[in-house]
């Protein structure tokens, strides 16, 4: 069997939804990108797709309040979920987002994996752990990307990856941890390979 590989550079914007009920039909395959506001989700999507402005990066954390869908190829979609956990967002809105994220992870049939992005210097905050827990309890595989890895030396980076790998063992799910830096092109290939492995299951179903 030939190796399954999608060309992420062909990814294009599909649509935005204010909540899970406005999403397109639950079909094909989706992989979600989740993370705290300013964890670097948009930057990671832009690096993966080699498009500077595919996902709008914002200097204001909490700006991305919509669910944004991108199509790699027909039936293969990437989903940019609203950033969570930013203090300047009203409490009511934060709770609403968390409810929506939980609903999406637990009820979206075409969701096949979750990429959770965390700043390598501040990983595994409460809401990050909540996201991992939701994903694992929904039998979804998880890739934890420790972003902004260029901010640490190589030895500090390796140490932090090891620490996070040990810290997530109690979750007991299919959780992989990798360092990532859009700026220094660290981890982009690993991200693409993981997405391919998740997407390829559509062919075997």
Curated annotation (Swiss-Prot):
Q: Which GO terms describe its biological process?
A: division septum assembly
Q: Which GO terms describe its molecular function?
A: GTP binding; metal ion binding
**UniProt keywords, alphabetically:** Cell cycle, Cell division, GTP-binding, Magnesium, Metal-binding, Nucleotide-binding, Septation
Report domain EngB-type G positions. Answer: 27-201
Q: Which residues bind Mg(2+)?
A: 42, 64
The record's Gene Ontology cellular component field reads: cytosol
> Out of the domains of life, which is the source?
Bacteria
According to the UniProt entry, the coiled-coil residues are none
Quick one: which residues bind GTP?
35-42, 62-66, 80-83, 147-150, 180-182
Q: Which cofactor does it need?
A: Mg(2+)
InterPro entries in the cross-refs: G_ENGB_dom, GTP-bd, GTP-bd_ribosome_bio_YsxC, P-loop_NTPase
SUPFAM superfamilies registered for this protein in UniProt: P-loop containing nucleoside triphosphate hydrolases
Q: What does this protein do?
A: Necessary for normal cell division and for the maintenance of normal septation.
Give the similarity note. Belongs to the TRAFAC class TrmE-Era-EngA-EngB-Septin-like GTPase superfamily. EngB GTPase family.
**In its UniProt entry, what is this protein called?**
Probable GTP-binding protein EngB
């Amino acid at each position: 069997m030939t190796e399954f590989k999608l060309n992420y550079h062909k990814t294009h914007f599909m649509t935005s939804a204010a909540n899970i009920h406005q999403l397109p039909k639950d079909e094909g395959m989706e992989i979600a990108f989740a993370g705290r506001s300013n964890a670097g989700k948009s930057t990671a999507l832009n690096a993966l797709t080699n498009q500077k402005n595919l996902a709008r990066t914002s200097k204001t954390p909490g700006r991305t309040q919509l669910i944004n869908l991108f199509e790699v190829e027909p039936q293969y979609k990437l989903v940019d979920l609203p950033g969570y956990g930013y203090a300047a967002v009203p409490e009511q809105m934060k709770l609403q987002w968390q409810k929506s994220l939980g609903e999406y992870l637990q009820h979206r049939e075409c969701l096949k994996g979750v990429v959770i992005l965390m700043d390598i210097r501040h990983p595994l905050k409460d809401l990050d752990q909540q996201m991992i827990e939701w994903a694992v309890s929904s039998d979804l595989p998880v890739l934890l990307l420790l972003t902004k890895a260029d901010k640490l030396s190589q030895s500090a980076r390796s140490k932090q990856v090891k620490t996070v790998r040990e810290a997530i063992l109690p979750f007991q799910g299919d959780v992989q941890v990798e360092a990532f830096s859009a700026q220094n092109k660290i981890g982009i290939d690993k991200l693409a390979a993981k997405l391919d492995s998740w997407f390829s299951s559509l062919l075997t179903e």
